[in-house]
UniProtKB/Swiss-Prot annotation:
Part of a SCF (ASK-cullin-F-box) protein ligase complex. Interacts with SKP1A/ASK1. GO terms for cellular component: nucleus. InterPro entries: F-box-like_dom_sf, Kelch-typ_b-propeller. Residues 34-79 form the F-box domain. One of its GO terms (biological process) is protein ubiquitination. Residues 1-29 are annotated as: Disordered. It is found in: Nucleus. The lineage of its organism: Eukaryota, Viridiplantae, Streptophyta, Embryophyta, Tracheophyta. This is F-box/kelch-repeat protein SKIP25.
Amino acid sequence: MEKKLKRRESMSTTAAESPPAKRRRTVTGNENSALIEGLPDHISEICLSLVHRPSLLSAVCTRWRRLLYSPEFPSFPSLYALFVDSTSDTGRVNPSVRFMCFNPVSSKWYPLPPPPPDPPLHRILYRHPSFISFNLPIQCVSAAGKLILIAGSNQQLSPAISHPLIFDPISSSWSSGPRIGSPRRWCATGACDGAIYIASGISSQFSSTVAKSVEKLDLTEQNRNNHRFNWEKLRDMRDLRFSREAIDAVGYRRKLLMVNVKGDAVKEGAIYDVVKDDWEPMPEEMLVGWRGPVAAMEEEILYSVDERRGTVRKYDDEKREWREVVVVEGGEEMLKGATQVTADSGKLCVVTGDGKIVVVDVAAEPAKIWNVEIPDGLEPVSVHVLPRMSQPNFC
């Protein structure tokens, strides 16, 4: 962060020392002028795409800033979050559900366009008077560069979602996916190799058939463009122990990793091989690290956040052991109560039980940690990293 500030200060100083005419031309960024003087725009776009810090491009001129959000320019990662309206109402009134995107260049939150009216978001329950001690899960996953709302409960405590809601950041639009074979709630949801998976859980009433069933939807462009864009039934799970609560199925090296309960309770882990369509038990040395939310960086490196201690661990697949990641002083305190985590671009984005979003830069030594300021009156449920939205109002 200090380096970032110093670079911005350096840019400001350079601009202040430039001749007035040149400074006006740079800051104004005439729409008809070349992106880079003396170069065709298509060559300039290639050159600018090699700059890996969008904030630097945004600070130069309006035209470069607009280029950042154009469909022709490579997307930079942005943070997407599912929020609910925060409330201290003792009656546990159900709050509104909304989706927003955090732009790392402008450091501002922007609402996503309204999703399709079916299912209405206000019918998805997060709080209910019958469940005072915990909130009802609303399950989202990200895959193939898209955000998918896949499971939740309605007022009758039945599955609220029969068709997944899919948001595409590039087109800034929502669509309804094909009907889920067995709509469910309190299930395992995850993604691997561009496909989303839904497993176990409960339908309107408990069913052993649903509790063992697994379905897959391939979201890759090749599959979406053909006539087979439908849910595919996979090999059943071996038992019913994964229908107790909503859990994450973590995509890792062409496998899905699932652990049936959260917290310090006795756990059971299962691994689904997406290539062989087969199940195997999770090794004890891997299972022991599940002390909080877990995510896989680029589906290759596992990280866990201990919800009680706030420690970050990284799984060494060769040695089959979890190793603690050293973080800056006071970092563990910020991560206590972690409820959900996503991993991308060398960073972990963590939702904590006290309603905060914390970023951990695990590429740094020691790992740096900071809070992302969230909009007033909102409580984060889950976060995801996807390409930025192509919207001119970001500029």
